[in-house]
Amino acid sequence: MILLGIDFDGTSHEVGRGIPPIGQHSWGRYSARAGVPRHLDMLDRMQVPATFFVPGYDGEQHPDLVAEIATRGHEVAAHGYLHEAWDLQPEEEETLLRKTDQILRQVTGQPVMGWRSPSGRKSNRTLGVLKSMGYIYDSSDKDYDMPYRLRYGKGDGDSIIELPNNTYSLDDFPFFKFSFTPPSLVLEQWKQEFDVIYKNEGFFVLSVHPRSGWGSGTPSRTRLMADIITYIKGHDGVQFMRAKDYAQWCVNHSNRLEEVTIL
């Protein structure tokens, strides 16, 4: 199973830290102006679906573009409001989760089904709020190779599908933030990761950010995405799915999944 996760991460990344998105801090503006449109066109050419994790603030700033993501057949999922570090008080956390949900629903005209933490963090309250809004999955944890049922409370309905994104090397950030690795070398790394996962009939989750700077929005790095998709499509039996579709399959076949309890 192949999930392509594209973290929109526009100017929310800077604005949330009190940094004006200008000059050397304007990388997030590239996401909306060039990176996301380029990725959408690439995905059309490759004929594969993806899940775009969108901060609520970016949905407010670029409603037409976020709506276009949905109309072109991709999923729009939640990714915080201002790409918060998620060290929030209970009321603030719930307010931001519900605010982002409302923004994305209004922009796309579709329900939001999943969430990925903008910082990799969550609290012991997060999943309960998500479930109360009708979400069926989270994609933040790093603790397993396959999807599972994550039980966060003692009630009958206190569980959610976890789609872990646990492989740091299947993310553009470490390659382009710290070393500006050539895309050709990143492609080889991603191929090696895929080969092992494919051999073991596993779960391949790729995470990219269509920004400039440390992201994958520029032409050579978007081509990297196309190259790994082409490589994957050359293997028998692979299937690309939106996260919400795979999560719904997991819900429908939950008896096949391991359950993990975190209280």
Predicted regions and their residues:
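Positively charged, amphipathic and often flexible ligand-engagement surfaces
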Residues: L163-F180, E201
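Catalytic alpha-helical scaffold of carbohydrate-active enzymes acting on polysaccharides/glycoconjugates
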Residues: M1-G114, S119-L163, V186-L206, W214-L263
